[in-house]
Amino acid sequence: MAVTADWSERGEYMLARHSIHPAWANEALDDPDRVVITPDPASKSGRAVRTIGWSYTANRIIAVITLVDNGRLHGVNGWVANSSDQRLYREEDRDE
């Protein structure tokens, strides 16, 4: 089953702010080689999760922030991964 987030509340924001389409973020979430960081180091609540994965459509490594609320996975934000997140992704890929 594919991993997808509900972007109904934050998808337009992410697209406007970071030029990341929700479909690209969902591709990164569903990447079998994704890196999941729980909790996201920047999370103020400690509930957000950072996933670093590959989007085939965007042809980029994308960092995606999600939050589970009432049993549902909500997309919070996403952007092209910075050099640190890209390094984590590539190191995980080599370790396997």
Q: Where in this protein do the model-derived segments appear?
A:
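Ribonuclease/tRNase effector modules and their secretory precursors
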Residues: 1-96
